Amino acid sequence: MGTRSIISFTSSKDMNVTFDPFKLPEGNPFAPFYDNEDLKKALRNVKKNTEEVRFKKGETYSIYCHWDGYPEGVGVALVNNFRDEDAVANLIAAGDCSSIMGHVVPYTTRGEKFKQPYDMPLGSWCANVDAEFVHRWTPDGWEVAEIPDFYDDDGVEKHGVEFDFQPTAEVAAEYLNS
């Protein structure tokens, strides 16, 4: 089972973005879901299944990533490759992904229907998708937090639980490119 994570950002402006695999950073390109799958077929699936995302200023948007969600995996890929809001918005507009470490692999590549990004502040819902980490982009860079325990032993949501975000560049320093 993968180390699952949430990738999130709060938009600083209103913008409409449709995921464009050709606008991904050179160091973190698009890839098909299956290694033996034709790249052109995967691109057709993405084009057919992806929808425009309407980001609103001040709103938080998040996607799920199944593999390598720990700081040394997804965190390093984010810090090294997704350095400005436009690049982050394009990634979020890809929708939920199997992986983003090394290659961005949205679930739409295998023909799945596009699911709009979560458009709510980070909170207990993150635990409900079985994610272990949250990666959050800010104008100051990427931050990461383990998902805290939002529920007591009886399954009742605790009040006042917060994420303990740390700069990803510090948490994963030994794994980052210079």
Model-identified regions with their sequence ranges:
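Short loop/turn segments at secondary-structure transitions that flank enzyme active sites
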Residues: M1, K13, D68-P71
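Extracellular beta-rich globular recognition domains, centered on the fibrinogen C-terminal
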Residues: G58-D86
